[in-house]
UniProtKB/Swiss-Prot annotation:
Activity control note: Allosterically activated by ADP, AMP, or fructose 2,6-bisphosphate, and allosterically inhibited by ATP or citrate.
Gene: pfkA
Gene Ontology biological process: canonical glycolysis; fructose 1,6-bisphosphate metabolic process; fructose 6-phosphate metabolic process
GO CC annotation terms, alphabetical: 6-phosphofructokinase complex; mitochondrion
Location of the region described as C-terminal regulatory PFK domain 2 in the Swiss-Prot/TrEMBL record: 404-785
UniProt protein name: ATP-dependent 6-phosphofructokinase 1
Stretch list, region Interdomain linker: 390-403
ATP-binding among keywords: yes
Family the UniProt entry places it in: Belongs to the phosphofructokinase type A (PFKA) family. ATP-dependent PFK group I subfamily. Eukaryotic two domain clade 'E' sub-subfamily.
Binding site for Mg(2+): D117
Top-level taxon of the source organism: Eukaryota
């Protein structure tokens, strides 16, 4: 057999291949775009393998070099634009032999695979067989010894693309939050018809072996009952379900009933629980007009949400870095995420743990299966069970342990505020505490606490909090006023209503309010109670956390806005939109949105704006448009934080670009303003609100029975709950090591150390701005387009 001609010498630049395999997931295109552009920026060549492993086996035109501009506009596209397939040929050694030959012919020695556990298992098997495959290719005369010398080692990096979020070792997989968004949108829409006709709806969602989508959608929509594969219902579940639904409708006045069921749901004997069976039970036993809605493949479709765009982009960049860092001895990694931190996890360890869960379910070892799920999954399941209904007599505390906990919103409205309050109230009612909502912030407390017949301080009923499950903004009212405006009256109100704990939901003003109360404890003993801040602000500028409720809702609203105006810009071919974002003196929203929409440039207050920067960026735009040559998706977006510069305003920048363009392209200013606060909260803000609010209540509970002086002496009696790296933790506000002294930039109303600042360089790399004018590969690729 004739030997195939392949490069005898290794190419001057390393060649990295990227493929998507298995079921498609929103965000896969973002991952491919990031791999391609980061590879080019790093001096490598990027190759796309079309139609998954099938393309690797067939070779030829199914393995193509991809240039910088080839992936323009991919972030907002759903599915996978390089195709995906479940390849039977690659499962056989003969198929993998062909794949190895095709890779060597193309000079590719590294592969980034985006897919589920099956796809990643195949990738690791391919790597383990690689030396044997090369040896066989030489023996059969397909390749020569000289041809395989540069390719003795195959580096493989995995990215988990799966809407089910079924991979162990990671909090989220690419596509899972986009799918969850589709489900929540559908259930939110069902609410109206269910309420109108007092109907019940059984909603079937995807998830054969993993109940993540079902659990998170149940939390996000306040479902009455839930079925997931990992934790089947106990014997007699039919009676339990009917009892809860009957109580919710007859005693609590609910007009709608929602039951969420994962497609892989079963009982403890592994008998399948179908949506039609559940419908029949509700219809026959409760005489409830019930409908079944099977969402099906709508859960896979559509553009990726903000989180999936950001996650896929950052993981794609990290995958290229991992390839370049790997040695012949390095195990294949999969890029995972824990809370807010990217990690490199041994691929086979993650795959093994994932398969073990499915095996344990099949063996009916359900407790062990739950144990192998991430701790976050178990925590959410516990939270759902204990907030879906107040009927938990075993959890009720004795009288002397019960507390009166005030809940107040401070600052601007943010998505998730209502959900945090709902979760706190539900938990309090489950435990026997009294939850007191303070309406309209501290002014409401001081001015209207004695109003009749309705005081601004009042208990929240189960029926009232249940209506907040998908509501945006703040139903109890919020404003920016602080307690220092009237300490005397505030303290008297604390005494009058006998507050034993304070739960404050809000932004930097909430942080400031608790700081003021803490510092006033010596003069006002009423403030010697445990106080917790749950950050909720679109600006994400609260010290002690890398995530604030509302920031994800804001980003989703903003990318929808940017996608729409980019379409306008692209339709006009040569147009730049300068979009003004909110965020105060923190550039988090602008930078993260810039990453999610593929902005050409992002201006933030941390860096400021000067004339040299603008001149360089205008040259950058000129170069962009000069090389477009009528290409599609040619519209450009620039994001500017509202306080990035007092001189170079959004309109001024747009006018400067238009003037300097000399008619070759044009620009427009766009200010979405308060539209960025969003409508209904995103699923991420809903579920994190539940988890963090319950943790806050549990933290306040630890102070039950302590004296006022004991509480004041405890540095954790005034805290902020937050995400830091891979952990969720409480950070003390006071003391020499507290947030107030060490992490707060009071003048600029933001943390001193902003974790996201490194993202700015990633935005610049992927837009090409970082390498413009430096002769880097990122722009020489235009000559090859």
């Amino acid at each position: 057999m004739a030997t195939t001609h392949a490069p005898a010498e290794p190419p001057k630049r390393r060649r990295i291949g990227v493929l998507t395999s298995g079921g498609d997931a929103p965000g896969m295109n973002g991952a491919v775009r990031a791999v391609v552009r980061m590879a080019i920026y790093s001096g490598c060549e990027a190759y796309a393998v079309y139609e998954g492993y099938e393309g690797l086996v067939h070779g030829g035109d199914m393995i193509r070099q991809v240039h910088w501009e080839d992936v323009r506009g991919w972030l907002s596209r759903g599915g996978t634009l390089i195709g995906s397939a479940r390849s039977m040929a690659f499962r056989e050694r003969a198929g993998r032999l062909k794949a190895a030959k095709n890779m060597i012919v193309r000079g590719i020695d590294a592969l980034v695979v985006c897919g589920g556990d099956g796809s990643l298992t195949g990738a690791d098997l391919f790597r383990s067989e690689w030396p044997g495959l090369l040896e066989e290719l030489v023996k059969t005369g397909e390749l020569t010894e000289e041809q395989i010398v540069p390719y003795k080692v195959l580096n493989i990096v995995g990215l988990v693309g799966s809407i089910d979020n079924d991979m162990s070792g990671t909090d989220a997989t690419i596509g899972c939050y986009s799918s969850l968004t589709r489900i929540c949108d559908a259930v939110d829409d069902v609410f109206d018809t269910a309420y109108s006709h007092q109907r019940g709806f059984v909603i079937e969602v995807m998830g054969r072996h993993c109940g993540w989508l079902a659990l998170m959608s149940a939390i996000s929509t306040g479902a009455d009952w839930l079925f997931i594969p990992e934790m089947p219902p106990r014997e007699g579940w039919e009676d339990d379900m009917c009892d809860i639904i009957t109580k919710n409708r007859q005693e609590r006045g609910k007009r709608r009933t929602i039951v969420i069921v994962a497609e892989g749901a079963h009982d403890r004997q592994l008998n399948k629980i179908t949506s039609s069976k559940i419908k029949d039970i509700l219809t026959n036993r409760l005489d409830l007009d019930t409908r079944v809605t099977v969402l099906g493949h709508t859960q896979r479709g559509g553009a990726a949400c903000a989180y999936d765009r950001t996650l896929s982009t950052l993981q794609g960049v990290e995958a290229v870095r991992a390839v370049l860092d790997m040695t012949p001895e390095s195990p294949s990694p999969v890029i995972t995420v824990r809370e807010n931190k990217l990690l490199r996890t041994p691929l086979m360890d993650a795959v093994k743990a994932t398969k073990e869960v499915a095996d344990l379910i099949h063996e009916r070892k359900f407790d062990e299966a739950m144990h192998l799920r991430d701790s976050e999954f178990k925590e959410y399941h516990f939270a759902y069970k204990n907030t879906a209904t107040p009927d938990h007599p075993k959890l009720i505390l004795p009288e002397n342990k019960r507390m009166r906990i005030a809940i107040i919103h401070v600052g601007a409205p943010a998505g998730g505020m209502n959900q945090a309050t709902r979760a706190a109230v539900a938990y309090c009612q489950t435990r026997g505490h009294t939850a007191l909502a303070v309406h309209n912030g501290f002014p409401g407390l001081c001015r209207h606490h004695a109003d009749t017949p309705v005081s601004s301080v009042r208990e929240v009923s189960w029926e009232e909090q249940d209506t907040w499950v998908n509501e945006g903004g703040s139903d109890i009212g919020t404003n920016r006023s602080l307690p220092s405006e009237d300490f005397e009256t505030t303290a008297k109100c604390f005494e009058k209503f006998k507050f034993d704990g304070l739960f404050v939901v809000g932004g930097f003003e909430a942080f400031t309010a608790v700081s003021q109360l803490r510092q006033a404890r010596e003069k006002y003993p009423a403030f010697k109670i445990p106080m917790v801040v749950l950050p909720a602000t679109i600006s994400n500028n609260v010290p002690g956390t890398e995530y604030s409720l509302g920031s994800d809702t804001c980003l989703n609203t903003l990318i929808d806005f940017c996608d729409a105006i980019r379409q306008s810009a692209s339709s006009s071919r040569r147009r730049v939109f300068v979009v003004e974002t909110q965020g105060g003196k923190s550039g988090y929203v602008a930078t993260t949105a810039g990453l999610a929409v593929g902005a050409s440039a992002v201006y933030i207050p941390e860096e400021g704006i000067d004339i040299k920067m603008l001149a360089r960026d205008i040259d950058f735009l000129r170069n962009n448009f000069a090389h477009d040559k009528g290409a599609n998706r040619a519209g450009k977006i620039i994001l500017r934080n509202e306080t990035a510069s007092s001189t170079y305003t959004t309109q001024v920048i747009a006018d400067m670009i238009k003037e300097e363009a000399k008619g070759r392209f044009e620009s427009r200013a766009a200010v979405p303003g308060h539209f960025q606060q969003g409508g209904k909260p995103s699923p991420m803000d809903r579920i994190r609100a539940l988890r963090m609010a319950i943790r806050c209540m549990q933290h306040i509970e630890t102070f039950s029975g302590k004296s006022a002086d004991e509480i004041a002496a405890d540095e954790l009696s005034a805290t902020v709950i937050g995400v830091k790296g891979s952990q969720v933790l409480f950070s003390q506000m006071g003391g020499p090591n507290g947030l107030e002294a060490t992490e707060t930039d009071w003048a600029r109303r933001r943390p001193k150390d902003e974790f996201w600042l490194d993202l700015q360089s990633t935005v610049n790399i992927l837009s090409g701005r970082a390498s413009f004018g430096e002769g880097k590969t990122g722009w020489s690729c235009y000559e090859n387009c």
